[in-house]
Structure formats: C-alpha cells, structure tokens
UniProtKB/Swiss-Prot annotation:
UniProt: FAD binding residues: 255-283
Record's protein name: Protein FixB
Gene that encodes the chain: fixB
UniProt xrefs under HAMAP family: FixB
NCBIfam families (alphabetical): PRK03363.1
Domain of life according to the entry: Bacteria
InterPro entries: DHS-like_NAD/FAD-binding_dom, ETF_a/b_N, ETF_a/FixB, ETF_asu_C, ETF_asu_C_CS, FixB, Rossmann-like_a/b/a_fold
Pathway assigned in UniProt: Amine and polyamine metabolism; carnitine metabolism
The protein's assembly and partners: Heterodimer of FixA and FixB.
Role: Required for anaerobic carnitine reduction. May bring reductant to CaiA.
Native organism taxonomy: Bacteria, Pseudomonadati, Pseudomonadota, Gammaproteobacteria, Enterobacterales
Repeat is among the record's keywords: no
C-alpha cells in the first residue's frame, strides 16, 4: 500500500495550503482539512479536500494551538492511523508537537520529501545543519510532519469540486497558554515562494540602512526582497518571514541575486534550486561563489547603485 487511507491537513498560513494539499493528494485516498473560517474551507474544497473541519468557538485570548486537543480527538475518531501535514512555520511545529503527544505519533520536522511504503511514511530532511540528508521511516500508526516550503508544487483550485463541511467545537484544554496582549508587527506581506526574481541580502550589506539599495534594485527589475537568517534573527533588520534557509524558505526562482551573503550550507539549502545564482561579495573566497553561476567581487554598497542604473535601462 503506497498511500494512507486518510491525511489531515492544517495551515496557519493560507499561502502554504495549496502545496500541502497537493502533497496530500499524492499521499492519501481521502483528504481532511482543518480550517479556521468559511473562506478557508471553500479554498480547501477547491484544492481537493473531501472533508473540511471548521475549528470554531475559540475565545480571543486563547491560542490556535489550543485546538490541538479537539483536532487529535477528531483524527482518532475517524481512523486508527493517518498522516498529518503541517507547514514548517513556528506555529506549525508547535502544533505538531502537541498533536504528536496526543496521538502517540512520531513527529518529523522540515520534511523535504515524503513517500509511503507499506502503509508507513518515509521522510527525508536535512540533518547536521544541512550537511546531509537523513531518511526516516515512521513506524507509529499516526505520523505528524511539518513540510518545508517548496517540497510540493502548489495544487490548482477547481471551483467545480465539492466536499463535506463539519464543525469542530472548541474545548478548553486542561493546561493552556492565555494571550494577555498583542502587538502589531509591521510587515509587508509577500509570497516569496512564487517570486520569479529574488534579491537576498546578508550581513555583508553592512547596515539596515543599506538594505534600501537592494530595495531600489528590486523595484528596477521587479524582484522580491529576501535575506539570510542572521539578518532576520540576529540583527533584526528584516522580518523572519523573509529569510531563506534550511529552517524557513526554500526557493526556486529563475534568478537568485545574493548580496553580501557568505554562502553557508544552511542558507544555500534554501536557494540552491534557483535556476541562476548571481553573487556579490567582497570576499573572493566566500563559499557563495562555489554555488554562483555569476559573481562580482566587490563592495555591495558601491555595486548595487551601478547595477540598478544599468538594469533599469
């Protein structure tokens, strides 16, 4: 048996749902999708869901992860085994841990390939900081996986599809995290997975202010702006959602222009599937040049304005 009887899908990020649904279609005979509202339910059915389970009734101060209990109960009630697919976002991984505990299931994060052999999931993902690919065969009846961006192509919606909709009512968990306050985050929403051209900056750009030079290049050529993990996580110069690498975005653009990025394996795992890689770095021995199809050795602060003028013509 090379498919599961059922797969359960949930995405806290709407843009990640189409690829998860495409993976679900390849891995199971019946697709169940948990959603948070009617609009997401309609999208899920158009993407191939046979059954949509609308999570309802959560108090505003409670977290989405607190639905884990009723989600696990629903999964158990509809089969003695199954596959759960989640995005490898922060919330996806937290929810995976909670579901794994409640389903007594193995959990595998950041999966880059998934197959089914004899009714069991076989998962591949990066190990040792991206230096190797590990393969795991999950033996538990339920398997909970968080999927790396780009693992599956996006499913295409079909408005003629039909499915059944059910409601899953909120049940307060015995131990819960209560949200006491929220703080709006300034973020320009962008779907980097679909970008044809990407300009990505590393700490070699020098300062947060210098990122404006990369933004000007993006405007000139119609590219989207991304970054390395240190720029987002260490320096806090850009949003977490924009960093490329093993534990976040895995991109496949036509052009990936790396500016001031050294080229460590953890980053290149997320960019190496690009059709063309162009690197700008002042260190001629930077590892990025081993991956680049084209490269310029020099100061990005001086090169970017000249490149912007040349490409804007």
């Amino acid at each position: 048996m090379n498919t599961f009887s059922q797969v359960w899908v949930f995405s806290d990020t709407p843009s990640r749902l189409p690829e998860l649904m495409n993976g679900a279609q390849a891995l199971a005979n019946q697709i169940n999708t948990f959603v948070l509202n009617d609009a997401d339910g309609t999208q899920a059915i158009q993407l191939g869901a046979n059954h949509v389970w609308k999570l309802s009734g959560k108090p505003d101060e409670r977290m989405i992860e607190d639905y884990a209990g009723v989600m696990a109960d629903t999964i158990r009630q509809h089969g003695a085994d199954g596959l759960v697919l989640l995005p490898n976002t922060r919330r996806g991984k937290l929810l995976a841990a909670k579901l794994g505990y409640r389903l007594n299931a193995a959990v595998s994060n950041d999966a880059s390939a998934v197959s089914v052999q004899d009714g069991k999931a076989t998962v591949k993902h990066m190990v040792y900081g991206g230096l190797a690919i590990g393969e795991e065969r999950i033996a538990t009846p339920y398997a909970v996986l968080t999927i790396s961006s780009g693992t599956f192509d996006a499913a295409q919606p079909d408005a003629s599809r039909t499915g059944e909709t059910h409601t899953v009512e909120w049940q307060a968990p015995a131990v819960a995290i209560t949200r006491t306050a929220t703080q709006a985050r300034q973020s320009n929403s962008v779907d980097l997975d679909k970008a044809r051209l990407v300009v990505s900056v590393g700490r070699g750009i020098g300062s947060k202010e210098n990122i404006a030079l990369a933004e000007q290049l993006c405007k000139a050529i119609g590219a989207e702006l991304a970054c390395s993990r240190p720029v987002a996580e260490n320096e806090k110069w850009m949003e977490h959602e924009r960093y490329v690498g093993i534990s976040n975005l895995m991109l496949k653009p036509e052009l990936y222009l790396a500016v001031g990025i050294s080229g460590q394996i953890q980053h290149m795992v997320g960019a190496n599937a690009s059709q063309t890689i162009f690197a700008i770095n002042k260190d001629k021995n930077a590892p990025i040049f081993q991956y680049a199809d084209y490269g310029i050795v020099g100061d990005a602060v001086k090169i970017l304005p000249a490149l912007t003028v040349a490409l804007a013509r």
